[in-house]
């Protein structure tokens, strides 16, 4: 078992991005401070009843896994899932502020043209259009606004897939996480399984923590054969240091390791839209547990102590990452979603209705905790993740 002290940072990645927050936290917070995404006044049309939301995100280093799969198997359609990853990372963030209709999306592909040929680019574009149509079929109005393909071989040895989404919603529909206060139930929605609108089983991995997941699980075979897929300045001890190849079965799962790592990020937008239509403003807050994993909630609300004492059992992909790497529980919950990638905050009397709605989408949901008043002397938010064996404290 290797040293688990901040393994993510040793690969050049920060789960907290504290240095980024140190800068942006002093900038204008927009029309509704406290929302999951920044919301501005309607600068595009000038409508006083509307506002603007614009958001950028992407598939991160998950595209490297698709690249490896393509190089070994020759099937460019593996990039269909990467297209979905990039889109979902934007749309699900927007959904956490109440935006899910009349969204225009643009995509940017930064590639090494030598390693990422035209047939793969075509598959990526095809995957984008296919997923957007699936969303529209589910009642989520998202349209493509085009995109950009940049050949930047000196920047990347493979490919980076990013998206940007913009909408002009009514101010009245915005979900403001500043309404997260003591006395609320926290409802978690499973990231694994197979929802009613997914074509295959989902491992729950999402699009966060993939740098560590890839290196912790995959073997030196990939270090030797794909030097373009990692930073040469990273200590070799932390590069492809796992026991598996992509086609190996994942323990306690129906998926291979590669399938689990490449499992397309589930969108919760149809579910969250349905919940909002049923309980309206009694949906006090929503958090997409992406970067920062289970600690993401700490950035929202004020004077809140988040108690999570009924989490889902971690899906097999997270169990195996921990088993082979020795990563601490503290770091696992900061890097990975650990079983639920969306949580909402509502009064306890609405919990059963929310869980019932989720069941209609075949997504497991349950009350995973509650909010209390912070015990910090300076009013700072706190988080406790409790299990039978230990309590993890953050904040």
List each language-model region with its residue ranges:
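Helix-biased detector of long, well-ordered alpha-helical tracts
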Residues: 1-395
């Amino acid at each position: 078992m290797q040293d688990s002290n901040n393994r993510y940072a040793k690969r050049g990645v920060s789960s907290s991005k504290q240095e980024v927050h140190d800068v942006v936290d002093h900038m204008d917070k927009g029309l509704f401070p406290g929302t999951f995404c920044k919301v501005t006044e309607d600068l595009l049309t000038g409508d006083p009843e509307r506002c603007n939301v614009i958001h950028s995100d992407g598939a991160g280093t998950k595209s490297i896994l698709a690249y490896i799969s393509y190089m070994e198997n020759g099937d460019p359609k593996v990039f269909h899932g990467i297209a979905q990853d990039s889109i979902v990372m934007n749309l699900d963030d927007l959904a956490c502020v109440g935006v899910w209709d009349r969204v225009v999306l643009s995509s940017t592909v930064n590639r090494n043209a030598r390693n990422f040929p035209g047939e793969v680019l075509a598959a990526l574009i095809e995957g984008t259009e296919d997923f957007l149509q699936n969303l529209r079929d589910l009642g989520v109005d998202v349209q493509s606004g085009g995109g950009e393909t940049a050949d930047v071989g000196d920047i990347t040895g493979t490919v980076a897939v990013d998206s940007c989404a913009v909408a002009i919603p009514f101010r009245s529909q915005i979900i403001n996480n500043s309404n997260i206060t003591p006395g609320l139930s926290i409802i978690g929605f499973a990231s694994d399984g197979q929802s009613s609108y997914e074509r295959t089983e989902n491992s729950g991995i999402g699009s966060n923590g993939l740098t560590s997941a890839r290196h912790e699980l995959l073997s030196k075979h990939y270090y030797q054969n794909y030097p373009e897929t990692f930073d040469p300045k990273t200590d070799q001890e932390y590069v492809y240091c796992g026991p598996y190849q992509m086609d190996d079965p994942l323990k306690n799962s129906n998926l291979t390791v590669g399938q689990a790592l490449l499992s397309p990020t589930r969108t919760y937008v149809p579910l969250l839209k349905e919940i909002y239509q049923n309980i309206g403003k009694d949906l006090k807050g929503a958090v997409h547990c992406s970067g920062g994993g289970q600690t993401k909630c700490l950035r929202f609300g004020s004077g809140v102590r988040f108690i999570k004492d009924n989490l889902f059992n971690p899906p097999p992909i997270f169990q195996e990452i921990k088993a082979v790497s020795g990563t601490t529980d503290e770091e696992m919950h900061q890097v990975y979603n650990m079983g639920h990638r969306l949580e909402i905050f509502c009064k306890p009397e609405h919990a059963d209705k929310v869980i019932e709605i989720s069941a209609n989408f075949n997504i497991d949901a349950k009350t995973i905790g509650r909010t209390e008043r912070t015990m910090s002397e300076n009013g700072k938010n706190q988080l406790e993740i409790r299990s039978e064996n230990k309590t993890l404290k953050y904040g």
